[in-house]
Structure formats: structure tokens, C-alpha cells
From Swiss-Prot:
Residues 155-227 form the RBD domain. A zinc finger (Phorbol-ester/DAG-type) spans 234-280. It catalyses: L-seryl-[protein] + ATP = O-phospho-L-seryl-[protein] + ADP + H(+); L-threonyl-[protein] + ATP = O-phospho-L-threonyl-[protein] + ADP + H(+). Its EC number is 2.7.11.1. Phosphorylated. This is Serine/threonine-protein kinase B-raf. Residues 1-15, 110-128, 314-328 have a biased composition (Low complexity). InterPro entries: C1-like_sf, DAG/PE-bd, Kinase-like_dom_sf, PE/DAG-bd, Prot_kinase_dom, Protein_kinase_ATP_BS, RBD_dom, Ser-Thr/Tyr_kinase_cat_dom. Residues 303-313 have a biased composition (Polar residues).
């Protein structure tokens, strides 16, 4: 501010009050004025002085904006100076306009008008002291050579925001109203989609579009108001001590003592209070508003409805949503480089990198689990990108999960080649791709990996000589012994399984109840006459499935290849979650529903830790024992869930459309299935649990659902959840159902959030009352001898046994 007010105020006042002789205007300007009419000859000098004052005032305003315009809470002296400069600028411009109009009409000025000019110039110069060096710059302006002088437009637009706030934005040509106000709205916790903007014209508010060029509105006042249907409230902050692990929603640092909004759940440190969004927006209902507004202006025609009948994998599916769509299209992110095997989505850009190893014939020992397994990622990028979303997503839980990955991987296969896969059994060369015939020969050790490891190579090399194999005796003994844990040991010969009644059919096969050393479930897969490549790929996937052992996973017991491919799993006494929720409509208590969600997340976390993508998670594949123990089935098996052409494997749209993620429906990527696509399906399962309904129940057209979900126009209606559903569960559901794949959390975070929610629920403990003493081992005869009545129990005569004193 000191720089802005530098210079001698006395000099500025004397200059514009006539004490000093001003420099005459340029000849061109004087000639123009002289020819414009027969007015006062002193008018051109007065116009000249006013123009200099306007320029200086505008420079002061621009300097203020450059200095303090980007601050959220600018100092009060800045606001006072800004208001003073803008008011003086308005007065000067009005006076200049009057002078120019009078010159054009040839009228003469009265004494009062010249007096007012002196007053304006004097008041302006008294507050805007101008240095002599600054005046010398503007005494020879270049823009005064125009034949028709016009009033300069105002470079700013005043905007009145919700909650009695206001701001000023520069009016730049080519910049829309949305871009100009985006930062101001974001600082107040708002987005343009939930607001409407109006201009004041003739005393009335007239709506304008967000894409209007703001330079057309120079000098006008805009009013931004929140839409009526948007549930906008103010925060309800309370001070809170977080005894469980929590993180600040702004700085993402550990939070012990801070504040929390009771309405939206936003939590923060006291030092971060200035960065908290000013508005408390219910974004769940906001999504419904966007969908309803879209269909008001874009009704779906019959042609668009039939568009979903085309096969998404063929490339005919629309790929880029229109500008009115809720979210932008999902773009692949760069491939990470570190070697912790945490799941990330497949990226088509890696295919060229894999091809540098060359094309060779497929090895019979190479595991073909490339579709269900994911390359390693950078831990720092994972933590930074995923963050800690919502309550109960602690950072140490994620690090604990990473340690599980290291401890569960005894085989030496941790290296940094993007095309490698981590398994729990001792494999041959490891592949990842969508076609057979690709092979990789990873180096023995690479910098940047956690450990220097050795990997088996297909081609001859020094690493094959790690053990002497020169003697034929050793080779014969190895051939005789073989591998103890071979996948061939899990093949059940034809005729040992007794197939019973048909239970049901799904997308990839038919399930029967069978007998094989007890009750088992036999799933006959829809693969007729498998090729040798398919058969070997199927066996390789079984090599991964046979390692799954978890309380919430259906136990894999074996497989058979004759008369057709079949998977044998344990028999689950009970019904599927779909049958409970939608057929017999079992009424579960909320604590039971949360426990079912916790067990499902626990089982999926285990599968993802094994680098297995479910690909078809839904309530039909979640089974409940009689004690409500969750068992997840029908996981993995990319060989069966893909389309084969000869020896090559291709992706196809598989699964049930209600549980499909938008990127899976679009099928734009070569392999759209990822851990995040399983998370989306889990979000739909949460929706079923918390509403008791299937999503999109109001739409009967299957193709319409495929089209709208794939384009991002449709999402489940979260307003239908039960009234007693915790807010944390509703927020978790919304996170899992994000339209952008990379914005969804992973199952370690989901499991931690649900466990924290389950611990925070109020539980009614049984009181240590008299009936509990009976259960502790006392007999009724023991109480017949003593007076054990409650103080409120009326005493009856003869109720005290055989004591003579009471008779």
C-alpha cells in the first residue's frame, strides 16, 4: 500500500487544481476537440486531466488485485482502498462521459459543471497521490490519436455470492463466467452446477448462462444464488477428541483434537479452519438433481435407447460423453514403477513396453492368470492419489496391508518389470497380457525394488545353473518325485463326483449339488471343447485359486476337465444374499447389515491381497450360512469369463449389468476389470443392504440402463437408504460408487472404515440381573431357602421356606 500511495499528494492536488500549468494535449487530440463543436476551449484540457486520473486509478486497482486478489481473507485496509478507488473511478468516468457528450453536442458548460470537475479532480488527487515519475509516463499517451474518443470499459465485474458475500473478478475477453467464478465458489465450498447466476438489468434479475463471456458483462453486477433443489446448509461444528485413528480432511495429517461437522462429517485441525468449505452440501441429492435436469433438456429417443444393443467391445459404443454429462471420461493414469504388489487398473499403454521382450511360443508351465492379476504400483503415488477418504481409513491400515503382501509372497518374484505378477507358489516365467504367446524374461535384480531377487528364466542363462544338474541320477530322481503341490493333484478324475439336483445357473455356468466325500457344489462351466491353450490357462488359474483359504471365501476343493470343465467348492448351507434381500425379504437389523458388509469387504480384501479380481461380485455370489457367516463364491476364472478366438483371449462384457462399473460397460480399455471395478460392485451390494432394493428399479429397459450408466448419466438413488443408516456408511457407499475409477477407495480402506463404524455403534449390554445368576450355575432350590426378592417385589406370607421365624 505504501508503494501505491507513494508520491507527493500536494503535487497531485496542485497539478489537477490548476496551480501548476498542465502540459497541453497532443495536437491530434486538440484538433479533434476543436472540430467537434464550439464549446469551451478549456474542456480538452479538462478531459486530458480526467483521462490521466482514470489511467492512474485503474493502475492502482490492478496493483491491488495483483497483490491481494488471490488471498482468501484479504486485510481490511485493502478492501477500504479498493472501494475508494472504484468509487472514484466511477465518478471520473461519468464526468468524462459528460464532457465528451457535451463536446459532441456543441453545448457549453456552466460554472457549476466546471466547479464539480474541480471537486472531482481535487478529491481524486488527494487520495491518489501520484509520483512525478508516474505522470511523465502518461503525458504522451498513444491511444489519444483515435478520431472518435470513447469511454473506456470497466475492467471488473462485481459479484454477489450466497451467504451475504461478494467478490470482484476481472473482466477478461475470452473467459467464461464459469471460469471466472470457479475459484471464488470453490473457496466457499460451492460448484457452478449447484448455483444459478443472474444479471441486474432495469432493476430485474435475468438469468444468464455459465458459458457467457464475462467481458460482455463489464461493469455490471452479477448475483449468484444456490438452486432451490440443492440441499445447502451451514456447518454444525463441534469440538471433538478422536480416540481412534483419524486424519484431517484438508491436510491429511493425523488428527487427535480438532473439530467435526455433525452434518457432513468434515473434520479438521484448528489451524486448518480457514480452509474449510463455507457451505455444507449434500452431494448425494445433488447427483439426483443433475440427472433430473439432464432428462428435462435431453430426453432419450428411441434411437439412443437402441444404441445400447450394439456390443460395447466392438468399438461402436459411444466413448466421449457430451458436455452436459456429470463427470468427464475416465482416462488412464501413468503406470507406476515400484515393486509392492498393490492392485491398480490395467493400463493399455504398457502393452508396447511388454512387447519388447519379443514373441515366443508359450511355455506349458507359464501361469495364465494375467487377467486377474495386476502389476505393482508406487506406494507413494497410491497413498497420495487414494488419500484417506472418509472416517476410519487409517494410513497404518494401508501400510499393514502392504506388509501382508510381502509376508504372503515366499517366492522370489519381487522386481520392477511392469509386466510381472506376484504369486504365492513357485512359478515359471510370469506373463501378463491379453494374448497367448507373450513371455517375459525379467532381470535378476533391478535398482528401486525392495529386494534384490532372482527369477526363473525361460531362455538359457547363468541363472539356470544355480543347481548342478549334470548327473542323470539327479534328473531321474527329480522326475520321479515331481512337485508335491502340483495343480494336477487337484484334478478330480471323471466318475468320482456324483452330480445331484440343479441349483441355478449364472453368466458362466450352471451350479449343481453334488457328492464328493460329502456335500459339494459343482459348477459346470460354459466352455465346450476347450482348446489346449484354454485348458492350460484354466489349470494355471486353478493354481492360484487352490491357494485361497479364508473364512469369508468359499473353499476351493478341486476341478475336473471331463466330461466338461467344472469347479468343485464347499457346499454352503444357507441362501444367497440376493435370496434373503429380494425373494424372502428377510428383515435384518442395522448392526447385522453392517456386519455382513464387513465380512464381504474382509473376503474381498483377501482376494485382492492374492491379486485375484472377482469380476462378477454381486449379491447372488454372496452366501450366508445359518449363523450369518458370509462366503464369497464364483471369483477369478478369467479364462471362462473371456472370449477366445483360437489361441488368443479377448475381453467381453461379462457379469450382471446392475453391478457393472461404468468403465466395464464402456469396454474402451483392453482390460477394464480392476480392483476398483470390484469396489463399484461392492458399492451396489451396500446399496442393496441399506435399501433392500435393487438399483434402477424404476427403469425396465436393460439397454437404457447400459447406455445411461456407461455414459455417466445414471447412478443409484442414495436417498432411498434406510433412515437409521449411519452417515459414515452412506458416505462410504457414495465413495465406492464414484464414476471415476481412480477416485474409488481400495478394500483395505473400506474394511477399516466399516470396522470403525461397527465399533462406534451403540451396543446394549446385558445387565447382571437375577436371571443371569441362574445361568451361572445356581439351582432354583438354592433360592427357595433365602429371601432373594427384589426391593420392589411384594412380600407374601409363607414365601420364605421352612424358617420358623417367618411363619
Amino acid at each position: 500500500m505504501a508503494a501505491l500511495s507513494s508520491g507527493s499528494s500536494a503535487e497531485g492536488a496542485s497539478l489537477f487544481n490548476g496551480d501548476m500549468e498542465p502540459e497541453p494535449p497532443p495536437p491530434v487530440l486538440g484538433a479533434c476537440y476543436a472540430g467537434s463543436g464550439g464549446g469551451d476551449p478549456a474542456i480538452p484540457e479538462e478531459v486530458w486531466n480526467i483521462k490521466q486520473m482514470i489511467k492512474l486509478t485503474q493502475e492502482h486497482i490492478e496493483a491491488l488485485l495483483d497483490k491481494f486478489g488471490g488471498e482468501h481473507n484479504p486485510p481490511s485496509i485493502y478492501l477500504e482502498a479498493y472501494e475508494e478507488y472504484t468509487s472514484k473511478l466511477d465518478a471520473l468516468q461519468q464526468r468524462e462521459q459528460q464532457l465528451l457528450e457535451s463536446m459532441g453536442n456543441g453545448t457549453d458548460f456552466s460554472v457549476s459543471s466546471s466547479a464539480s470537475t474541480d471537486t472531482v479532480a481535487s478529491s481524486s488527487s488527494s487520495s491518489l497521490s501520484v509520483a512525478p515519475s508516474s505522470l511523465s509516463v502518461y503525458q504522451n499517451p498513444t491511444d489519444m490519436s483515435r478520431n472518435n474518443p470513447k469511454s473506456p470499459q470497466k475492467p471488473i465485474v462485481r459479484v454477489f455470492l450466497p451467504n451475504k458475500q461478494r467478490t470482484v473478478v476481472p473482466a477478461r475477453c475470452g473467459v467464461t463466467v464459469r471460469d471466472s467464478l470457479k475459484k471464488a465458489l470453490m473457496m466457499r465450498g460451492l460448484i457452478p452446477e449447484c448455483c444459478a447466476v443472474y444479471r441486474i438489468q432495469d432493476g430485474e434479475k435475468k438469468p444468464i448462462g455459465w458459458d457467457t463471456d464475462i467481458s460482455w458483462l463489464t461493469g455490471e453486477e452479477l448475483h449468484v444464488e444456490v438452486l432451490e433443489n440443492v440441499p445447502l446448509t451451514t456447518h454444525n461444528f463441534v469440538r471433538k477428541t478422536f480416540f481412534t485413528l483419524a486424519f484431517c480432511d484438508f491436510c491429511r495429517k493425523l488428527l487427535f483434537q480438532g473439530f467435526r461437522c455433525q452434518t457432513c462429517g468434515y473434520k479438521f485441525h484448528q489451524r486448518c479452519s480457514t480452509e474449510v468449505p463455507l457451505m455444507c452440501v449434500n452431494y448425494d441429492q445433488l447427483d439426483l438433481l443433475f440427472v433430473s435436469k439432464f432428462f428435462e433438456h435431453h430426453p432419450i429417443s428411441q434411437e439412443e435407447t437402441t444404441l445400447g444393443e450394439t456390443t460395447p467391445a466392438s468399438g461402436s459404443y459411444p466413448s466421449v460423453p457430451p458436455s452436459d454429462s456429470v463427470g468427464p471420461p475416465i482416462l488412464p493414469s501413468p503406470s507406476p514403477s515400484k515393486s509392492i504388489p498393490i492392485p491398480q487398473p490395467f493400463r493399455p499403454a504398457d502393452e508396447d513396453h511388454r512387447n519388447q521382450f519379443g514373441q515366443r511360443d508359450r511355455s506349458s508351465s507359464a501361469p495364465n492368470v494375467h487377467i486377474n492379476t495386476i502389476e505393482p504400483v508406487n506406494i507413494d503415488d497410491l497413498i497420495r492419489d487414494q488419500g484417506v477418504r472418509g472416517e476410519g481409513a487409517p494410513l497404518n491400515q494401508l501400510m499393514r496391508c502392504l506388509r501382508k503382501y510381502q509376508s504372503r509372497t515366499p517366492s522370489p518374484l519381487l522386481h520392477s518389470v511392469p509386466s510381472e505378477i506376484v504369486f504365492d507358489f513357485e512359478p515359471g516365467p510370469v506373463f501378463r497380457g491379453s494374448t497367448a504367446g507373450l513371455s517375459a524374461t525379467p532381470p535378476a535384480s533391478l535398482p528401486g525394488s525392495l529386494t534384490n531377487v532372482k527369477a526363473l528364466q525361460k531362455s538359457p542363462g547363468p541363472q539356470r545353473e544355480r543347481k548342478s544338474s549334470s548327473s542323470s541320477e539327479d534328473r531321474n530322481r527329480m522326475k520321479t518325485l515331481g512337485r508335491r503341490d502340483s495343480s494336477d493333484d487337484w484334478e478330480i478324475p471323471d466318475g468320482q463326483i456324483t452330480v445331484g439336483q440343479r441349483i441355478g445357473s449364472g453368466s458362466f455356468g450352471t451350479v449343481y449339488k453334488g457328492k464328493w466325500h460329502g456335500d459339494v457344489a459343482v459348477k459346470m462351466l460354459n466352455v465346450t471343447a476347450p482348446t489346449p491353450q484354454q485348458l492350460q490357462a484354466f489349470k494355471n488359474e486353478v493354481g492360484v485359486l487352490r491357494k485361497t483359504r479364508h473364512v469369508n471365501i468359499l473353499l476351493f476343493m478341486g476341478y475336473s476337465t471331463k466330461p466338461q470343465l467344472a469347479i468343485v467348492t464347499q457346499w454352503c448351507e444357507g441362501s444367497s444374499l440376493y435370496h434373503h434381500l429380494h425373494i424372502i425379504e428377510t428383515k435384518f437389523e442395522m448392526i447385522k447389515l453392517i456386519d455382513i458388509a464387513r465380512q464381504t469387504a474382509q473376503g474381498m480384501d483377501y482376494l485382492h491381497a492374492k491379486s485375484i479380481i472377482h469380476r462378477d461380485l454381486k449379491s447372488n455370489n454372496i452366501f450366508l450360512h445359518e449363523d450369518l457367516t458370509v462366503k464369497i463364491g464364483d471369483f477369478g476364472l478369467a479364462t471362462v469369463k473371456s472370449r477366445w478366438s483360437g489361441s488368443h483371449q479377448f475381453e467381453q462384457l461379462s457379469g450382471s449389468i446392475l453391478w457393472m462399473a461404468p468403465e466395464v460397460i464402456r469396454m474402451q480399455d483392453k482390460n477394464p476389470y480392476s480392483f476398483q471395478s470390484d469396489v463399484y460392485a461392492f458399492g451396489i451390494v451396500l446399496y442393496e443392504l441399506m435399501t433392500g432394493q435393487l438399483p434402477y428399479s424404476n427403469i425396465n429397459n436393460r439397454d437404457q440402463i447400459i447406455f445411461m450408466v456407461g455414459r455417466g448419466y445414471l447412478s443409484p438413488d442414495l436417498s432411498k437408504v434406510r433412515s437409521n443408516c449411519p452417515k459414515a456408511m452412506k458416505r462410504l457407499m457414495a465413495e465406492c460408487l464414484k464414476k471415476k475409477r481412480d477416485e474409488r477407495p481400495l478394500f483395505p480402506q473400506i474394511l477399516a472404515s466399516i470396522e470403525l463404524l461397527a465399533r462406534s455403534l451403540p451396543k446394549i449390554h446385558r445387565s447382571a440381573s437375577e436371571p443371569s445368576l441362574n445361568r451361572a450355575g445356581f439351582q432354583t432350590e438354592d433360592f427357595s431357602l433365602y429371601a432373594c426378592a427384589s426391593p420392589k417385589t411384594p412380600i407374601q406370607a409363607g414365601g420364605y421356606g421352612e424358617f420358623a421365624a417367618f411363619k
